[in-house]
Amino acid sequence: MSSTSLYAAIDLGSNSFHMLVVREVAGSIQTLSRIKRKVRLAAGLNSDNTLSAEAMERGWQCLRLFAERLQDIPPTQIRVVATATLRLAVNAEEFLAKAQEILGTPVQVISGEEEARLIYQGVAHTTGGADQRLVVDIGGASTELVTGTGAQTTSLFSLSMGCVTWLERYFADRSLTKENFDLAEAAAREVLLPIADVLRYHGWKVCVGASGTVQALQEIMMAQGMDERITLAKLQQLKQRAIQCGRLEELEIEGLTLERALVFPSGLAILIAIFSELNIQCMTLAGGALREGLVYGMLHLSVEQDIRSRTLRNIQRRFMIDTEQAQRVASLASHLLSQLDGSWELDPLSRDLLLSACSLHEIGLSVDFKRAPQHAAYLVNNLDLPGFTPAQKKLIATLLLNQTNAIDLSSLHQQNAVPPRVAEHLCRLLRLAILFASRRRDDLLPAIQLAAHDDQLTLTLPENWLAEHPLGREMVDQECQWQSYVHWTLRVTSGDTPR
């Protein structure tokens, strides 16, 4: 592999140090490695903002690991930035001099506003959804809030509060009491107050979180089978659970890793304050943040309007998927869905996810025809799909698993991107679109009429179509049977003759 295609971004954060190494492939990035170490630099700041020798040593120790990996990468393709703690520390120069010596490359201490801008760029390049967004990143010693549309930011703020500093300030006794949470939330709201009106003025259609706290929340909700949207009600539930645990060392929540537990309550308190103060309805996890912003900045890649479409095109090219057939199936699925508008109300996101599944439905053939749906589900579950959240990936994988043959109803109910009934509806539409497009020619697609009464589907085919297409008739009969096994009613008529 040519080293000139390699890029590295290192973020010396207040809680963790991160390194991202990527390879540029045809205008997009392929992640080669991610290394993260909990350094808790902010915990080493005293009341005079002097960084302790122990904290500096923890940081240098981590950088020695990173340095080994950087030897393979041209210096012009490496960016190392330091954030809140090293902005604050009065003896930052001492740490930075040795850090640069260890890494053999300059370390740039970036301003809070520049950090916010880079975070937004990382989100814009990797996260799907509406263009107008609010981005929230809770770090160890600072919290960034950014509004923007497309690639352009409209307001940028970096606030002096973070999960490590709030831990030391409001949970220093390690007690998870209502009083400690109330103090932490009130302090966070006070910090937010001067900027709240500006953020509300610029507005947003979607809110995304790009921090360890939000990642932890996502993992908790996935583990507990909840849908992936973070809401204030869910945050309050988790706060009550933390209070029940009593002490930080006894904090146990299903899905919360030991590594994230220490700063989880303080991050949770800050997030509750942000939700309350800004009246946020729901938040999802961003696909990238500061490090991705650094990498895309080095590559000078423009932000695409539709990240999901770019991802699907890249995957189709990589796995040599027949794009004409994928489009044929997607067009048919869209046509079938449009006929059910009055009866099956699917929101625009559900429709997009159905069409994404259509785009990738033959990916399993790149492994083998035998067990192709299982191969497809495995690949989608394990591929990096910028623009899609973990729950959305799981839904697409589940739809592909159930695209033909026997239906695994439990898998459709276990995904958490959409309600189970919606997943069933998407699955039925995908199966019918694949079945009727199987001849791989537009001129052979029958004029299908589809109607729904609750969960009963009635499929009307042109007169004599079944008689003239014996294989097609057999496939339709088999599909009716597969659907009946999971108590889905599919009634087929040909002209005026019901079957």
UniProtKB/Swiss-Prot annotation:
<protein>
    <recommendedName>
        <fullName>Guanosine-5'-triphosphate,3'-diphosphate pyrophosphatase</fullName>
        <ecNumber>3.6.1.40</ecNumber>
    </recommendedName>
</protein>
<dbReference type="GO" id="GO:0015949">
    <property type="term" value="P:nucleobase-containing small molecule interconversion"/>
</dbReference>
<keyword id="KW-0378">Hydrolase</keyword>
<dbReference type="InterPro" id="IPR003695">
    <property type="entry name" value="Ppx_GppA_N"/>
</dbReference>
<dbReference type="Pfam" id="PF21447">
    <property type="entry name" value="Ppx-GppA_III"/>
</dbReference>
<dbReference type="Pfam" id="PF02541">
    <property type="entry name" value="Ppx-GppA"/>
</dbReference>
<comment type="similarity">
    <text>Belongs to the GppA/Ppx family. GppA subfamily.</text>
</comment>
<dbReference type="InterPro" id="IPR030673">
    <property type="entry name" value="PyroPPase_GppA_Ppx"/>
</dbReference>
<dbReference type="InterPro" id="IPR050273">
    <property type="entry name" value="GppA/Ppx_hydrolase"/>
</dbReference>
<dbReference type="GO" id="GO:0015970">
    <property type="term" value="P:guanosine tetraphosphate biosynthetic process"/>
</dbReference>
<comment type="pathway">
    <text>Purine metabolism; ppGpp biosynthesis; ppGpp from GTP: step 2/2.</text>
</comment>
<dbReference type="GO" id="GO:0008894">
    <property type="term" value="F:guanosine-5'-triphosphate,3'-diphosphate diphosphatase activity"/>
</dbReference>
<dbReference type="GO" id="GO:0015974">
    <property type="term" value="P:guanosine pentaphosphate catabolic process"/>
</dbReference>
<dbReference type="InterPro" id="IPR023709">
    <property type="entry name" value="Guo-5TP_3DP_PyrP"/>
</dbReference>
<comment type="function">
    <text>Catalyzes the conversion of pppGpp to ppGpp. Guanosine pentaphosphate (pppGpp) is a cytoplasmic signaling molecule which together with ppGpp controls the 'stringent response', an adaptive process that allows bacteria to respond to amino acid starvation, resulting in the coordinated regulation of numerous cellular activities.</text>
</comment>
<dbReference type="InterPro" id="IPR048950">
    <property type="entry name" value="Ppx_GppA_C"/>
</dbReference>
<dbReference type="InterPro" id="IPR043129">
    <property type="entry name" value="ATPase_NBD"/>
</dbReference>
